[in-house]
């Protein structure tokens, strides 16, 4: 008796494929455009997996390519878990699971918004300013180590987020939606925002220097020594760094009024130069 049973080989992504997706994801923003934003970058990152799951250059491979040319936009580092989840979905679909294009794109769209809300405050509002402050503090002493330290630390975090994000998303599959659901994203975003504001508040007092040398009084003591009281002396007694803090609040108010940041910078230059020329501001 001849056994005519046909066996179908399960299609499985390898660690090499996942590393390929990770490496390509570093060029995520390379083809950004106003029409579909990061769609080309997402599709480019998925190519190693698509080649593995659809080895023949047939209609299935073409459909997989087209599937990932839909609109996509999120914080580029936290796109890694979305890539991982998409890898798991594509693998299941290639093995016969009933997963249509709408389901895959729906997962991508559903994750890209919440993760962008987490990635922006964490990376742009916290990680980068903290490492930049650390590097700038060292660079101000004349050391080249400052910018190098910033470059190395920031890229270590960036690469680790991308690599482990892809691996985590792939291992969890669609369960990642549940893991990052509920109040977790909100708490993480709130915590990162508070930390970022704390760091920026410390930087305002450290880096911003305003001196108002207008003389309020001159008093000569019994020894003949003259004591000069300026406006800046009084302000420092009330609250050190009060003027820089008020200027920061003014910038925030102008930004909320949609004033171009370039005009704010130019305005500060004009105020500083004019104030120094008139004697209202000092070094």
From Swiss-Prot:
Q: Keywords, A to Z? A: Cell inner membrane, Cell membrane, Formylation, Membrane, Phosphotransferase system, Sugar transport, Transmembrane, Transmembrane helix, Transport
Residue list for modification N-formylmethionine: 1
Q: Which residues lie on this side of the membrane: Cytoplasmic?
A: 1-14, 53-59, 93-100, 174-183, 256-261
- Pinpoint the PTS EIID domain residues: 11-281
PROSITE patterns, from UniProt?
PTS_EIID
Residues on the membrane's Periplasmic side span 141-144, 210-241, 281-283
- Gene Ontology biological process terms from the UniProt entry: D-glucose import across plasma membrane; fructose import across plasma membrane; mannose transmembrane transport; N-acetylglucosamine transport; phosphoenolpyruvate-dependent sugar phosphotransferase system
The record describes its membrane topology as: Multi-pass membrane protein
Subcellular location per UniProt equals: Cell inner membrane
Residues that span the membrane, as ranges: 101-140, 145-173, 184-209, 242-255, 262-280
Task: Report the superkingdom from the record.
Answer: Bacteria
- What Gene Ontology cellular component terms go with this record? membrane; plasma membrane; transmembrane transporter complex
Q: Which GO terms describe its molecular function?
A: protein-N(PI)-phosphohistidine-mannose phosphotransferase system transporter activity
Per the entry, intramembrane positions are 15-52, 60-92
Disulphide bond pairs: none
What causes induction of this gene?
Expression of the manXYZ operon is positively regulated by the cAMP-CRP complex and negatively regulated by the Mlc transcriptional repressor. Expression is also weakly repressed by NagC.
Q: What is known of its domains?
A: The EIID domain, with its homologous EIIC domain, forms the PTS system translocation channel and contains part of its specific substrate-binding site.
Kindly state the subunit structure of this protein.
Homotrimer of protomers that are composed of two subunits, IIC and IID.
Query: Which purpose does this protein serve, as stated in its record?
Result: The phosphoenolpyruvate-dependent sugar phosphotransferase system (sugar PTS), a major carbohydrate active transport system, catalyzes the phosphorylation of incoming sugar substrates concomitantly with their translocation across the cell membrane. The enzyme II ManXYZ PTS system is involved in mannose transport.
Q: What is this protein called?
A: PTS system mannose-specific EIID component
What is this protein's gene name? manZ
């Amino acid at each position: 008796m001849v056994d005519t049973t046909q066996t179908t080989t399960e299609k499985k992504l390898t660690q090499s494929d996942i590393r390929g997706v990770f490496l390509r994801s570093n060029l995520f923003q390379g083809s950004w455009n106003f029409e579909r934003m990061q769609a080309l970058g997402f599709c480019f990152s998925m190519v190693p997996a698509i080649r593995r799951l659809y080895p023949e250059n047939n209609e299935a491979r073409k459909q997989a390519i087209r599937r990932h040319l839909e609109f996509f936009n999120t914080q580029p580092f936290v796109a890694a878990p979305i890539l991982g989840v998409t890898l798991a979905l594509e693998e299941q679909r290639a093995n016969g699971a009933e997963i249509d294009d709408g389901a895959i794109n729906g997962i991508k769209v559903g994750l890209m918004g919440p993760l962008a809300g987490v990635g922006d405050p964490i990376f742009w509002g916290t990680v980068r300013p903290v490492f930049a402050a650390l590097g700038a503090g060292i660079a101000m002493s004349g050391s080249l180590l400052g910018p190098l330290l910033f470059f190395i630390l920031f890229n270590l975090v960036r690469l680790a987020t991308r690599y482990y994000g892809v691996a985590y998303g792939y291992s969890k599959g669609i369960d990642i939606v549940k893991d990052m659901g509920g109040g977790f994203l909100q708490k993480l975003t709130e915590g990162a925002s508070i930390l970022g504001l704390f760091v920026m508040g410390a930087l305002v007092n450290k880096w911003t220097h305003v001196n108002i040398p207008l003389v309020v009084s001159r008093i000569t003591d019994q020894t003949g020594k003259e004591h000069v009281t300026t406006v800046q002396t009084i302000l420092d007694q009330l609250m050190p760094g009060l003027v820089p803090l008020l200027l920061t609040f003014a910038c925030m108010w102008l930004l909320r009024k949609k004033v171009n940041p370039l005009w704010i910078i130019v305005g500060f230059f004009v105020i500083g130069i004019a104030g120094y020329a008139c004697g209202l501001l000092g070094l």
